[in-house]
Amino acid sequence: MNANPKFLSADAHVDAAAVAPLPNSRKVYVTGSQPDIRVPMREITQADTPTGFGGEKNPPIYVYDTSGPYTDPDAKIDIRAGLPALRQGWIEARGDTEVLDGLSSQYGLERAADPATADLRFPGLHRNPRRAQPGKNVTQMHYARQGIITPEMEYIAIRENQRRAEYIESLKSSGPNGAKLAAMMGRQHPGQAFGAAAFGANALAEITPEFVRDEVARGRAIIPANINHPESEPMIIGRNFLVKINANIGNSAVTSSIGEEVDKMTWAIRWGGDTVMDLSTGKHIHETREWIIRNSPVPIGTVPIYQALEKVNGKAEDLTWEIFRDTLIEQAEQGVDYFTIHAGVRLQYVPLTANRMTGIVSRGGSIMAKWCLAHHKESFLYEHFEEICEIMKAYDVSFSLGDGLRPGSIYDANDEAQLGELKTLGELTQIAWKHDVQVMIEGPGHVPMQLIKENMDLQLDWCKEAPFYTLGPLTTDIAPGYDHITSGIGAAMIGWFGTAMLCYVTPKEHLGLPNKDDVKEGIITYKLAAHAADLAKGHPGAQVRDNALSKARFEFRWEDQFNIGLDPDKAREFHDETLPKDSAKVAHFCSMCGPHFCSMKITQDVREFAAQQGVSETEALKKGMEVKAVEFVKTGAEIYHRQ
């Protein structure tokens, strides 16, 4: 997109690559108990098994879909108008909110009145902000603790189940071997859940709306869903649900435009970003955020201290509670779903970082540390935490309690500063829960593999099982340019141990601002890590997709292999580098082993030989060995023969 502001406002359009359905996929909707609960999923169509392999039908599989209306050909996408307000009716029906006469943030009013920002502003439908009525609490946690199952909770239950039961039933009716096929495709290894809900190897265990309600009421899961972001499709973050991933986007003082950030958001959700954080620190933060929220079907998070710092020209010591409070209200009225707030960075912890290799690496943490030292006072975020809770519950903004003292190197992992802050975050969680405000806890950082589980165990203990949300962790410091891999290793491990959401790392980590390609690379890496964690935990149905892809691979259904994978485009591109012809898409080999050494083709030959001889596969292998032994002796018992 052109960075010219007038062009952006007048002619902004969505990136065409972000709206095309993925190959052999279509958007389907599952309706809940009322017509306006329509839960999106991605249906991946599969080819029939070739006759030589049995000839059965392979029904579609269903996968979790974060792309919103963008990949629905029936949806009219116009980013100048924004997305439909999916949750508006549910919010209004609860009767506990009020529409304000206008913005109540001083900064928001100033931006709205500034003619210099007119060409930058989101031009779509203008809705006055909504807030809880006096004395009311509008958080999903509050409803859950009242025993209320909201439409959001029902939506989430349907979404988490991914039509597993329907898929298994379709397998059973696929032919004479349907029951056997269903048993095979639904098979799943028992997991090790480390104290999370034990589903065993039951692929059909169902996530119910009541289960969702109970997890939210206990504080073990959150539903980030600001009442001013009705465009969002409800999702849940908790260790007893699918592991989620977050994608960071945002401009900087030196690069990127509003249009580029909207593009990154739509690109991130296409590939599986469950939430997106706008970490903009450059120009027009307010306007950039409005464009992103109005066009985002996933929850949006921010770090409000970044914008507050811009309001005081980058001087941390000039920050005040009043400026920060106004920033919270400004962003809550725009519709931000969760705030990273570094309230655990206390004055007493700052000296503990003096002997670190890399000091304080969190931007938010360093801002608050500098403020504490400049004033030699306790952090205003800590001192005013109860007042922050009052703001959060008026809009249903969730806390993401920031790890401002996270280790920025392997050397600093699990040190006194990091763990001291974590204990404080546990104390703040209890305060937030008194207000029925939803909380997740942010975690490291750079941690070697042998120390990762300790991080998880301490967080579960000190923070009373509030969802953990971690950046990686990176398991080594030696690979600039590959930190999506160094962190993906740690992410898979900590996700298995109980982390509920993983914040992606791109190849540009520590090096520069990521572009769209970097965003995709980070997303795919972290989708892989999250899925590996789901498998290891034994989450219901986690293995269905693996089984479907493995069956397609064994039957040489190349197109299905590509399409079931996390990145069909890259899989197809790699295959076609060496075997580009269409005929190669039905060949019983790839370029790795060629036609004579494909292990799966050899296995198929053994099975075919066994069927012809009327013997078991083991006996067939034995007979085959005997035949080859005779041939070997007849040819002179030489290992090599001159051609």
Curated annotation (Swiss-Prot):
Binding, Zn(2+): H446, H510
GO cellular component, one term: cytosol
Binding site for substrate: N248, M277, Y306, H342, S362, R363, G364, D403, G404, L405, R406, E442, Y469
EC assignment: 4.1.99.17
Keywords assigned by UniProt, alphabetized: 4Fe-4S, Iron, Iron-sulfur, Lyase, Metal-binding, S-adenosyl-L-methionine, Thiamine biosynthesis, Zinc
Cofactor(s) this protein requires: [4Fe-4S] cluster
Cofactor binding, per record: Binds 1 [4Fe-4S] cluster per subunit. The cluster is coordinated with 3 cysteines and an exchangeable S-adenosyl-L-methionine.
Chain residues that bind [4Fe-4S] cluster: C590, C593, C598
Reaction(s) this enzyme catalyzes, per UniProt: 5-amino-1-(5-phospho-beta-D-ribosyl)imidazole + S-adenosyl-L-methionine = 4-amino-2-methyl-5-(phosphooxymethyl)pyrimidine + CO + 5'-deoxyadenosine + formate + L-methionine + 3 H(+)
One GO-annotated biological process of the protein: thiamine biosynthetic process
Entry coiled-coil feature ranges: none
InterPro entries found in the cross-reference section: ThiC, ThiC-associated_dom, ThiC/Bza_core_dom, ThiC/BzaA/B
PANTHER family xrefs: PHOSPHOMETHYLPYRIMIDINE SYNTHASE, CHLOROPLASTIC (PTHR30557:SF1), THIAMINE BIOSYNTHESIS PROTEIN THIC (PTHR30557)
Family: Belongs to the ThiC family.
Full protein name: Phosphomethylpyrimidine synthase
Origin species: Burkholderia ambifaria (strain MC40-6)
High-level lineage: Bacteria, Pseudomonadati, Pseudomonadota, Betaproteobacteria, Burkholderiales
